[in-house]
Amino acid sequence: MSRPLTFLGIESSCDDTAAAVVRAEGTRAEILSSVVDGQTALHAAFGGVVPEIAARAHAERLDLCVERALEEAGLGLRDLDGIAVTAGPGLIGGVLSGVMLAKGLAAGTGLPLVGVNHLAGHALTPRLTDGLAFPYLMLLVSGGHCQFLIARGAEEFSRLGGSIDDAPGEAFDKTAKLLGLPQPGGPSVEAEAASGDPRRFAFPRPMLDRPGCDMSFSGLKTALLRARDGLVAEKGGLTRADRADLCAGFQAAVVDVLAEKTRRALAFYAAEGAARPALAVAGGVAANGPIRAALTSVAEAAGVRFLAPPLRLCTDNAAMIAWAGIERFRAGGRDGMELSARPRWPLDRSAPALIGSGRKGAKA
């Protein structure tokens, strides 16, 4: 059995400043502390995350979060075995703030420095919480990303498909903005949809008529915009029932797309011949109740185990970064002072870029 390791994790890739301490012994892990300082109030007036504001907030808060995480864990820097930090992908200003702090701590203490792919942090969370064995199928669904991955190792992922445009979380945020709901959009739309009729509006289920596991959500967002504008033109505004029905219809369409694409991904994953096949979901959108329920049903029908992290570990956090750093460190991964912040960092570097990735290639 590998020796116990205690790592500090640092996360600053979007609008959550976070630090955590995780101790691992073999396949067992314990989160000794997890501090998340969100920036929702800073960005609320803008209807979305403003990169410059986010970067400044990270620079102001990161050292305080690290101090709190160590204090809550009852440890000092001398008690750690390493420092893990999100090195990408993400908003470059925030990622850079985290990387520079981690470098300074590593240089000052002599501790190993491990750069972590933010998405690997999400994808490896089921191993932190449940000790899930490789290989497993992962649906990574968040504000900026959506892809199906077969996780074979701490740094070995095979992408089966992903969104060619908007990620579901981004679509939820834009839907909330279009309907005048507060950010972040995911919880707001889900709460509003609870009292709505999902059948009132015939929203599309994009790309279900095409084979494979790729997805698209920008057309769904456009359909909602047109439905909203039609109601405004007809009535002069939206009632509470209109908003609830629009949210319910939008959410039902997202659920249907994710459920059907998951069925297809499970068919590809079956060829892996895993001894204990499992489907896991991670990322901020994994906190959505109807999405979890639909994926649970899909997994049960396929006869595979379904795992979803606790809600506090679905959204961005540093515990997953500390754990992913431990996993990478155990596999021989370690970085020096040349570690750089990366706005783009695909998990499966051998996979072709998805349509819509742009000239610079895949972001993740």
From Swiss-Prot:
<dbReference type="GO" id="GO:0061711">
    <property type="term" value="F:N(6)-L-threonylcarbamoyladenine synthase activity"/>
</dbReference>
<keyword id="KW-0808">Transferase</keyword>
<feature type="binding site">
    <location>
        <position position="118"/>
    </location>
    <ligand>
        <name>Fe cation</name>
    </ligand>
</feature>
<keyword id="KW-0408">Iron</keyword>
<comment type="similarity">
    <text>Belongs to the KAE1 / TsaD family.</text>
</comment>
<dbReference type="InterPro" id="IPR043129">
    <property type="entry name" value="ATPase_NBD"/>
</dbReference>
<feature type="binding site">
    <location>
        <position position="173"/>
    </location>
    <ligand>
        <name>substrate</name>
    </ligand>
</feature>
<keyword id="KW-0479">Metal-binding</keyword>
<dbReference type="InterPro" id="IPR017861">
    <property type="entry name" value="KAE1/TsaD"/>
</dbReference>
<dbReference type="GO" id="GO:0005737">
    <property type="term" value="C:cytoplasm"/>
</dbReference>
<dbReference type="InterPro" id="IPR000905">
    <property type="entry name" value="Gcp-like_dom"/>
</dbReference>
<feature type="binding site">
    <location>
        <position position="122"/>
    </location>
    <ligand>
        <name>Fe cation</name>
    </ligand>
</feature>
<dbReference type="GO" id="GO:0005506">
    <property type="term" value="F:iron ion binding"/>
</dbReference>
<protein>
    <recommendedName>
        <fullName>tRNA N6-adenosine threonylcarbamoyltransferase</fullName>
        <ecNumber>2.3.1.234</ecNumber>
    </recommendedName>
</protein>
<dbReference type="Pfam" id="PF00814">
    <property type="entry name" value="TsaD"/>
</dbReference>
<keyword id="KW-0963">Cytoplasm</keyword>
<feature type="binding site">
    <location>
        <position position="186"/>
    </location>
    <ligand>
        <name>substrate</name>
    </ligand>
</feature>
<feature type="binding site">
    <location>
        <begin position="140"/>
        <end position="144"/>
    </location>
    <ligand>
        <name>substrate</name>
    </ligand>
</feature>
<keyword id="KW-0012">Acyltransferase</keyword>
<dbReference type="InterPro" id="IPR022450">
    <property type="entry name" value="TsaD"/>
</dbReference>
<keyword id="KW-0819">tRNA processing</keyword>
<feature type="binding site">
    <location>
        <position position="316"/>
    </location>
    <ligand>
        <name>Fe cation</name>
    </ligand>
</feature>
<comment type="function">
    <text>Required for the formation of a threonylcarbamoyl group on adenosine at position 37 (t(6)A37) in tRNAs that read codons beginning with adenine. Is involved in the transfer of the threonylcarbamoyl moiety of threonylcarbamoyl-AMP (TC-AMP) to the N6 group of A37, together with TsaE and TsaB. TsaD likely plays a direct catalytic role in this reaction.</text>
</comment>
<dbReference type="GO" id="GO:0002949">
    <property type="term" value="P:tRNA threonylcarbamoyladenosine modification"/>
</dbReference>
<feature type="binding site">
    <location>
        <position position="288"/>
    </location>
    <ligand>
        <name>substrate</name>
    </ligand>
</feature>
